[in-house]
C-alpha cells in the first residue's frame, strides 16, 4: 500500500500540479483594451527654439480699476476692490495678479461678464488690509 502511494506521489511530482484556471466570464459585449504602460516622452531636441512668453501676465490680467459710485460703495462697505480684467483671466490668475501688483491678500474673487463683453472682478480683501488704503495707493480715488 505504501509503495503504491509513493509511486503515485512520484508520478504527480514528475507531472507537476497544474490546477485548472477558472475561465473569466465576460458580461459585456464590448472588449475594453487594458491600459498599458505609457512612458513619458524624451525628445531628442526641442520642437520650438524659443518658448512663448507668458500670454497673460499680471499687467495684462488687470486692465484697470473701476471707480463708479457702486464700486466706491463696495470699497467702503464691503472692503472689496472692483477691476476690469482680461476676458480669459480666471479667478486664480486674478488673485495672483492682485497679490503681485498690490501686495495685498485677496480672500475671495467674484467675476461677471458685462453686457458689453468685458469681464469685471470683485476682489474681496482680508480684514487686515483696508480697501480704501489700497485704492488710494493705486491712485483711483
From Swiss-Prot:
It is found in: Cytoplasm. It comes from the Eukaryota. One of its GO terms (cellular component) is cytosolic large ribosomal subunit. The modification Phosphoserine is found at residues 68, 70. InterPro entries: Nucleotide-bd_a/b_plait_sf, Ribosomal_uL23-like, Ribosomal_uL23/eL15/eS24_sf, Ribosomal_uL23_CS, Ribosomal_uL23_N. GO terms for molecular function: rRNA binding; structural constituent of ribosome. The keyword Nucleotide-binding does not apply. NCBIfam families: PRK14548.1. This protein binds to a specific region on the 26S rRNA. Component of the ribosome, a large ribonucleoprotein complex responsible for the synthesis of proteins in the cell. The small ribosomal subunit (SSU) binds messenger RNAs (mRNAs) and translates the encoded message by selecting cognate aminoacyl-transfer RNA (tRNA) molecules. The large subunit (LSU) contains the ribosomal catalytic site termed the peptidyl transferase center (PTC), which catalyzes the formation of peptide bonds, thereby polymerizing the amino acids delivered by tRNAs into a polypeptide chain. Component of the large ribosomal subunit (LSU). Mature yeast ribosomes consist of a small (40S) and a large (60S) subunit. The 40S small subunit contains 1 molecule of ribosomal RNA (18S rRNA) and at least 33 different proteins. The large 60S subunit contains 3 rRNA molecules (25S, 5.8S and 5S rRNA) and at least 46 different proteins. uL23 is associated with the polypeptide exit tunnel. This is Large ribosomal subunit protein uL23A.
Amino acid at each position: 500500500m505504501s509503495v503504491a502511494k509513493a509511486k503515485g506521489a512520484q508520478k504527480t511530482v514528475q507531472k507537476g500540479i497544474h490546477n485548472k484556471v477558472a475561465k473569466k466570464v465576460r458580461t459585456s459585449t464590448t472588449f475594453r483594451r487594458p491600459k498599458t504602460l505609457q512612458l513619458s516622452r524624451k525628445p531628442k531636441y526641442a520642437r520650438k527654439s524659443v518658448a512663448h512668453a507668458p500670454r497673460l501676465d499680471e499687467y495684462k490680467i488687470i486692465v484697470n480699476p473701476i471707480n463708479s459710485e457702486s464700486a466706491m460703495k463696495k470699497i467702503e462697505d464691503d472692503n472689496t476692490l472692483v477691476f476690469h480684467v482680461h476676458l480669459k483671466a480666471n479667478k486664480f490668475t486674478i488673485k495672483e495678479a492682485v497679490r503681485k501688483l498690490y501686495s495685498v491678500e485677496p480672500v475671495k474673487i467674484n467675476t461677471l461678464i458685462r453686457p458689453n463683453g468685458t469681464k469685471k472682478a470683485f476682489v474681496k480683501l482680508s480684514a487686515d488690509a483696508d480697501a480704501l488704503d489700497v485704492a488710494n495707493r493705486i491712485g483711483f480715488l
